[in-house]
Amino acid sequence: MESSNQPNVLIFDSGVGGLSVFQEINKRLPEVNYYYLFDNQAYPYGELSQETLLARVEALVVKMTQQFAIDLVVIACNTASTIVLPALRAKLPIPVVGVVPAIKPASLLANRAVGLIATPATVTRQYTHDLIRDFAHEKEVELLGSTRLVDIAEEKLRGRQVDQQELAMILKPMKHKVDVAVLGCTHFPLLKEEIQQVLGDEIILVDSGEAIARRVQSLLHQLSPQSTKTPWRIFSTAQPWDEAALNGSLKTMGFNAIELYPL
């Protein structure tokens, strides 16, 4: 087992979208030793059965938690969070933080209508409709499910130019209909500037990143920051496409080159 004097935080996702969550946590807790694991072998998670998804996430997270003496786990994926949290919390003796679409804060900000931009799996899941019923029942809610937006975010992190015309076509059903839009997938804050440009500055964009960062900070409030900081480690379950370009972006965030971590 490897250990260090720094608190070890594992951030888990099916792709690189969870890096938007990492960035928010890192703003508050730059002294933490970060491990990022993405299960790109099974990407996208929205196409997996619940049983397969649960088995994969549980196996990977438990293994890495034990190997690297992890102190806290963040499941930085909306799809996985709706399925795996109870099982992981029962198995692990450490805090496990999940993400949910920020429908409640969006509803409080909205005057007339809330938009939820998410993956098709999140848009159709009962859990999401329960959130809408509980926290946004007095508002009109527009739902937009897009897998292509996830791919665009993955491409952007590899240095590809975002096609604003394509983005405008995808987001067209949301334009002029809502005053607050929820970025309901952790990939989407990576496209926040481009989405804002398409929807217009009058639309407020809300995501879960800051709330997750506050939660992690409160759970790790007894940290003792160290003056020296080592490069953080990032793992994938299969070789990523355009790995060299992706490693370039990851280096600017403080990560070492991607290491293979098969299931």
From Swiss-Prot:
Pfam families linked: Asp_Glu_race
Binding residues for substrate: D13, S14, Y45, G46, N78, T79, T186, H187
Coiled coil: none
Keywords assigned: Cell shape, Cell wall biogenesis/degradation, Isomerase, Peptidoglycan synthesis
GO term, biological process aspect, one: peptidoglycan biosynthetic process
Catalytic activities: L-glutamate = D-glutamate
Pathway: Cell wall biogenesis; peptidoglycan biosynthesis
Active site, per annotation: C77 (proton donor/acceptor), C185 (proton donor/acceptor)
Gene3D superfamilies referenced in this protein's UniProt entry, alphabetically: 3.40.50.1860
Broad enzyme group: isomerase
Protein family: Belongs to the aspartate/glutamate racemases family.
Protein name, per record: Glutamate racemase
Originating species: Vibrio vulnificus (strain YJ016)
Lineage: Bacteria, Pseudomonadati, Pseudomonadota, Gammaproteobacteria, Vibrionales
Gene name, Swiss-Prot/TrEMBL: murI
